[in-house]
Design a protein with these regions (language model features):
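C-terminal helical "tail/cap" subdomain of flavin- and related membrane-associated enzymes
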Residues: 288-363
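Beta1/beta-strand and adjacent pyrophosphate-binding region of the FAD-binding site
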Residues: 1-14
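A conserved beta-strand/loop capping segment in the N-terminal third of enzymes
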Residues: 49-100
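Predominantly flavin-linked oxidoreductase catalytic cores and closely associated redox partners
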Residues: 11, 104-233, 250, 266
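Generic enzyme active-site microenvironment
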Residues: 31, 144, 261
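Hydrophobic anchor at the start of a short beta-strand
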Residues: 6, 28-29, 142
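FAD/FMN-dependent oxidoreductases across multiple families
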Residues: 120, 214-289, 294-295
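Glycine-rich FAD pyrophosphate-binding loop
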Residues: 20-42
Length: 363
């Protein structure tokens, strides 16, 4: 039976972040992934400034747009520019971003195996054994970075699929667009959520996001309608729907030698569905706990608690925002626009921006 120090199931942003740090420290790391074979994983690909600061290596080679201004609208009307003095987001194409991170993790010493199915798991005193495509692999630790519907959470902790939020996206070639948009958020484009337009040079990433508690619906027809309304064409390719894990404030994150990170841990921010920051952060924190070698599960839970507290505070904000959109958009537009954008450009989270600028003179 093959034996390694750490198995990381999932070679996306969370998994690669963990694998990079672990392998850089000299541990033997095996990444297992199915999406890496196809090269496309659903994700809008926006890397916020707070996320960019976490990476151990430059992202320049995969940056398609640098964003310091975006448009926000209510029901596709009342378009309002939101501007920061410095860039607050980098637009990447997710397959290219993932490939860069996999390459960096492998250069650090991690190995990658493309798999079809993780079907079994059991733990023992010195580690875990994972059954993958009918074969067993042993490790001292297991990191589940395989998404909101991932196998590791179900096998190690039980419970079925969870739906904190849903999104659907597609790519529209620039030649099919009647205009090339700025980065755009259209609140109310779908009930209980928003539509987005993320320009990427040769194409625009078009998507819809909803919080599932609101009863809204996203599907191919809704996405095609939105693309026609905003860009004059529904010639979308690579259309994919996907669940987002937004339950990290109450998810069981670790037990013994198993740690959950990224969407598998529910670390996506629920207001806008931004998941890359929580993914990279949790992957790095999981690696740090393993490298410290003490009470790994307890150390990881304690170390990631600040982000869990952020998520806990954002949930009621998101609920109020989407259920009172005409009022909340007005507050966003006339009240917190400037401090929010300044905070994001300085790498702050939503709650940190609120704390820093509470009582400031708003634009």
């Amino acid at each position: 039976m093959k034996q390694v120090d750490v198995i990381v199931v999932g070679a996306g942003q969370a998994g690669c972040a963990a694998a990079y740090d672990l392998a850089s420290a000299g541990l033997s790391v095996l990444m297992l992934d199915s999406h890496a074979a196809t090269g496309h994983k659903p994700c809008a690909g926006g890397v916020t400034e707070k996320a960019r600061r976490l990476y151990r290596f430059p992202l320049d080679s995969v940056v398609r747009e640098t964003v310091s201004q975006m448009q926000m609208s209510l029901y596709q009307k009342l378009e309002t520019p939101f501007t920061a003095d410095t860039p607050f987001c980098l637009m990447t194409h997710r397959p290219e971003l993932d490939q860069l991170c996999r390459d960096q993790a492998q250069q650090a010493g991690a190995s990658l195996t493309i798999v079809r199915h993780v079907s079994g798991f059991h733990s023992h005193g010195d580690g875990i054994v994972l059954t993958v495509d009918g074969e067993q692999i042993g490790a001292r630790y297991l990191i589940g970075a395989d998404g909101a519907h991932g196998a590791v959470r179900r096998l190690a902790f039980g419970g079925g699929a969870r739906h904190g939020a849903m999104a659907i996206e597609g790519l529209l070639s620039r030649e099919h667009c009647n205009r090339y948009p700025q980065t755009t958020f259209d609140f109310g484009a779908v009930r209980g959520g928003y539509g987005w337009l993320f320009p990427k040079g040769d194409h625009v990433n078009v998507g819809l996001y909803i919080r599932t508690q609101t009863g809204g619906k996203v599907d191919r027809h809704a996405l095609a309608d939105y693309a026609r309304q905003r860009l004059g064409s529904d010639a979308l390719t690579h259309v994919q729907g996907f669940p987002l894990g937004t339950w990290g404030h109450k998810q069981r994150l670790a037990a013994g030698r198993v740690l959950l990170v990224g969407d598998a841990a529910g670390f996506t921010e629920p207001l806008l569905g931004e998941g890359i920051y929580g993914a990279v952060l949790s992957g790095q924190r999981a690696a740090a706990a393993i490298l410290a070698g003490n009470d790994v599960a307890a150390d990881y839970i304690a170390d990631i608690d600040r982000w869990r507290s952020e998520l806990r505070r954002v949930h009621p904000i998101a609920a109020i925002f989407y259920t009172t959109l005409p009022i909340s958009f007005g507050v966003l537009k006339h009240g917190v626009r400037r401090p929010l954008m300044t905070g994001y450009a300085n790498g702050l989270t939503l709650v940190q921006s609120k704390r820093l600028f509470f009582g400031a003179r708003f634009q």
